[in-house]
């Protein structure tokens, strides 16, 4: 069933009419200053001139389209159910008709086939969760089953732990599955509240922690220096390729969905922080603005998971046990939606503070400044690189000039300066400390110290090493584990294709398309609005190329298979940048 088309389209027409009449409000990134002034060709920089709004017609609505229903599976002998599903062919966009939320169907059935789903348990079978635990864990005061059945009908409780101990910081988040296609944490897949009777204390900062059974190590890091790495980018294209895309990209796995090495955990592009970052920085695409990116990483702990005999969370355990043995994408897709695509095997916990100074090239040249001067002075203001005086001398800039640069940065919201924007991104710590840093002109030692103290007790997961979720399906817990594992791997391949934003139609003005469920949205750069980012004051904006979706893999030939994609979603025009990355991939087979 499709819903809400008339409402969406009426809203689209009213928004377009409102834009035509000039009643839309575009909030600027600087206090009170609109960010949608026309781009004049004065060395390519953004120069404020009399605005003329573009009223380009919004693209036609695109209706959501689902595939036809698959055939019903055979009746599953253990679940006594059969299944069918549909999948997304085309997402809705630009106020097109939405798809019915139901993309699978299940119905009861009868079969004479025997069910052999039980794994033999030599210990105690938990009443509700079905977990198998050692009998020595009964009546020990811990909820080893996850349903308290191991503590029921006890004449006496023999506690292993005689005193209360704390949970490791962020331990529940580390036990969650993670969707690496969207950089989001999902439901719990591991039980980090299970201790197998272990009660060895682990002291960190005078706090006594209890180590979960699944955890191999949780090592505190004692280095507490706030060192900044400052990097200069002479163009937006370099900044986008080396900074933005690394933060917001969707992982593109080629084979096996393995993650090689420890990697930075990016941000969710449709989150508030992701939208703010993309909107404000993309505003300066195809200008001659210069970028100074500063980054400080504070590590507070390193985490490592055991490599075998893991205790799964009972919710995940039951969901996997309820999967049909005959492959049905709809059921396996729901598991991936609810529990993610991967689980974390190693992690770095801590905080990241970073800011980006966006500088007007013409104003810098008029003031006889270089980006190196700004880098030295911004770093010197925080004491980076030793004595501030030595920093000034080393780069050949006077203390007065550095003072003027800092004044330009601090007064950018009050008057026109060579600083076009200061974009801050903070991860880790409490909301109060994050807010204080995010709205400060530049970080002070006092603010950084307060934030660092908060990060110790509220760390974010900033780097991870991960394995595909199907690696948790082992013969220890599941009958027919090899069949379920292969089904889950196949579903992961289909899921990657179905959730990719390459399915979305191009947004105008270099907007970023985001696929949310079965609907695409455009995240617009500053200076653009509308459902497709079609409303703007700017003219003749170069359009950067974006990739289409990958083709299916070819048949295996000569020990190799290939797939291809095209730079046509959209193709670059008006001097826009070409797509980065390969147009084809080849794998051994």
UniProtKB/Swiss-Prot annotation:
Domain annotation MACPF: ranges: 157-503
Residues making up the signal peptide according to the UniProt record: 1-31
Coarse class of the protein's main subcellular location: secreted
Residues that span the membrane, as ranges: 201-206, 209-213, 251-258, 261-268, 328-335, 338-343, 378-385, 391-398
Activity regulation, free text: Membrane attack complex (MAC) assembly is inhibited by CD59, thereby protecting self-cells from damage during complement activation. CD59 acts by binding to the beta-haipins of C8 (C8A and C8B), forming an intermolecular beta-sheet that prevents incorporation of the multiple copies of C9 required for complete formation of the osmolytic pore. MAC assembly is also inhibited by clusterin (CLU) chaperones that inhibit polymerization of C9.
Membrane topology classification: Multi-pass membrane protein
Compartment(s) where it occurs, according to its Swiss-Prot or TrEMBL record: Secreted; Target cell membrane
Keywords (A to Z) from UniProt: Calcium, Complement alternate pathway, Complement pathway, Cytolysis, Disulfide bond, EGF-like domain, Glycoprotein, Immunity, Innate immunity, Membrane, Membrane attack complex, Metal-binding, Phosphoprotein, Repeat, Secreted, Signal, Target cell membrane, Target membrane, Transmembrane, Transmembrane beta strand
Domain TSP type-1, residue spans: 63-116, 544-587
Modification Phosphothreonine occurs at: 417
InterPro entries: C8A_B_C6_EGF-like, LDL_receptor-like_sf, LDLR_class-A_CS, LDrepeatLR_classA_rpt, MAC_perforin, MACPF, MACPF_CS, TSP1_rpt
The record's account of how the chain is modified after translation: N-glycosylated; contains one or two bound glycans. Not O-glycosylated.
S-S pairs: 64-99, 75-109, 78-115, 121-132, 126-145, 139-154, 161-199, 377-402, 502-549, 504-520, 507-522, 524-533, 556-589
SMART domains for this protein: LDLa, MACPF, TSP1
GO biological processes: complement activation, alternative pathway; complement activation, classical pathway; killing of cells of another organism; positive regulation of immune response
Quaternary structure (record): Heterotrimer of 3 chains: alpha (C8A), beta (C8B) and gamma (C8G); the alpha and gamma chains are disulfide bonded. Component of the membrane attack complex (MAC), composed of complement C5b, C6, C7, C8A, C8B, C8G and multiple copies of the pore-forming subunit C9.
Family of the protein in this entry: Belongs to the complement C6/C7/C8/C9 family.
Protein name: Complement component C8 beta chain
Organism annotation: Mus musculus
């Amino acid at each position: 069933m499709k819903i809400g088309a008339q409402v969406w389209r009426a809203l689209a027409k009213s928004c377009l009419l409102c834009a035509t009449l000039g009643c839309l409000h575009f909030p600027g990134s600087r206090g009170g200053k609109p960010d949608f002034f026309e781009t004049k060709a004065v060395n390519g920089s953004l120069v404020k001139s009399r605005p003329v709004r573009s009223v380009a017609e919004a693209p036609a609505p695109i209706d959501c389209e689902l595939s036809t229903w698959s055939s019903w599976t055979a009746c599953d002998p253990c679940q006594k159910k059969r299944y069918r599903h549909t999948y997304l062919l085309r997402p809705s966009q630009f106020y097109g008709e939405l798809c019915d939320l139901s993309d699978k169907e299940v119905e009861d059935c009868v079969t004479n086939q025997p069910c052999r789903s039980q794994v033999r348990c030599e210990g105690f079978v938990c009443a509700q969760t079905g977990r198998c635990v050692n009998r020595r864990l009964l009546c020990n005061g811990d909820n080893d089953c996850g349903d308290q059945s191991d503590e029921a009908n006890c004449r006496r409780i023999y506690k292993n732990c005689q005193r209360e101990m704390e949970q490791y910081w962020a331990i529940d988040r580390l036990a969650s599955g993670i969707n690496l296609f969207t950089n989001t944490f999902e439901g719990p897949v591991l039980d980090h509240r299970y201790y197998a009777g272990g009660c060895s204390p682990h002291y960190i900062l005078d706090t006594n922690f209890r180590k979960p059974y699944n955890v191999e190590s949780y090592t505190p890091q004692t280095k507490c220096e706030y060192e900044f790495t400052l990097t200069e980018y002479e163009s937006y294209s370099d900044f986008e390729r080396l900074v933005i895309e690394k933060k917001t990209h969707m992982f593109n796995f080629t084979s096996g969905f393995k993650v090689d090495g420890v990697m930075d955990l990016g941000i969710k592009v449709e989150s508030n922080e992701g939208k703010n970052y993309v909107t404000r920085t993309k505003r300066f695409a195809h200008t001659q603005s210069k970028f100074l990116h500063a980054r400080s990483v504070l590590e507070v702990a390193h985490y490592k998971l055991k490599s075998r005999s893991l205790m799964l969370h009972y919710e995940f355990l039951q969901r996997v046990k309820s999967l049909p043995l005959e492959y049905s994408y709809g059921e396996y897709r729901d598991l991936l939606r609810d529990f993610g695509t991967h689980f974390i095997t190693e992690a770095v916990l801590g905080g990241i503070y970073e800011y980006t100074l966006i500088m007007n090239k013409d104003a810098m040249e008029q003031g006889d400044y270089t980006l190196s001067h700004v880098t030295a002075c911004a770093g010197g203001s925080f004491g980076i690189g030793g004595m501030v005086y030595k920093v000034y001398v080393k780069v050949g800039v006077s203390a007065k000039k550095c003072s003027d640069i800092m004044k330009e940065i601090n007064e950018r919201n009050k008057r026109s300066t060579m600083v076009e924007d200061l974009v801050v991104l903070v991860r880790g710590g409490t909301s109060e400390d994050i807010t204080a840093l995010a709205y400060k002109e530049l970080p002070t030692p006092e603010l950084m110290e307060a934030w660092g103290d908060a990060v110790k007790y509220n760390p974010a997961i900033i780097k991870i090493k991960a394995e595909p979720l199907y690696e948790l399906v082992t013969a220890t817990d599941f009958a027919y584990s090899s069949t379920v594992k292969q089904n889950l791997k196949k579903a992961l391949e289909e899921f990657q294709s179905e959730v990719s934003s390459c399915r979305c139609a191009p947004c105008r003005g270099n907007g970023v398309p985001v696929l949310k469920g079965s609907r695409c949205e455009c995240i617009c750069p500053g200076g653009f609005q509308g459902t497709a980012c079609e409303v703007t004051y700017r003219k003749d904006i170069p359009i950067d190329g974006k990739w289409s979706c990958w083709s299916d893999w070819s048949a295996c030939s000569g020990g190799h298979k290939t797939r291809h994609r095209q730079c046509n979603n959209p193709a670059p025009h008006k001097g826009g940048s070409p797509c980065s990355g390969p147009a084809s991939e080849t794998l051994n087979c």
